[in-house]
């Protein structure tokens, strides 16, 4: 199992806890609003909106909240903000690369909060391009294992452009090119396999191994960044060995 998959496992466990917070709901709602504004308010003709709604439903966001966000984004209802996507780059403890994806209606506030979180938790901001080249944009679909084997999932998505299927313990993760994401998700649906989320993600092409102490410091930094309402996603190139994961679970 590669380092990013272990990181994904840890992030998944954390996401289950985070899903209980209103902050996580707000970020999912924001994704729906932006997707509707960018590609139209009909999920049938807007795959990004469809997937944003699917993820929100799987995370138990109330249907009324989802529908209001869709309407705001589509211009059917007043109150939508002018959200902008901004990427920040930096280095965390142990030289770990950090890519921070913000969705904000106030660039100055977002920049200030990101900088504060970085400097207070052993990180440093970096110039644009100094970290992003270490990451590649990928399509990622996650699903609960259920009754499916890894081979079942692989057979369903192989011809749709899936590059790999990874067993993450309680879930499977399917990675593809971003352009094949809808095809992979559709292949699962045609095979009658339910999925949790389908979205574009950043994956590290070069990873940095850390010990348990280093991992805790990186998690602390990521937590601080994700406390900002403007931060949608935080990506790192940390590599967690099985030994480090076992120590973290103790």
UniProtKB/Swiss-Prot annotation:
* Keywords assigned by UniProt, alphabetized: Cytoplasm, DNA-binding, Transcription, Transcription regulation
**Under the GO molecular function aspect, what terms does this record hold?**
DNA binding
- Subcellular location field: Cytoplasm
Q: Extract the coiled-coil ranges from the record.
A: none
Q: Give the NCBIfam families listed for this entry.
A: PRK00110.1, PRK12378.1, YebC/PmpR family DNA-binding transcriptional regulator
What's this protein's family per the entry? Belongs to the TACO1 family.
- The entry's protein name is Probable transcriptional regulatory protein RHA1_ro06891
UniProt organism field:
Rhodococcus jostii (strain RHA1)
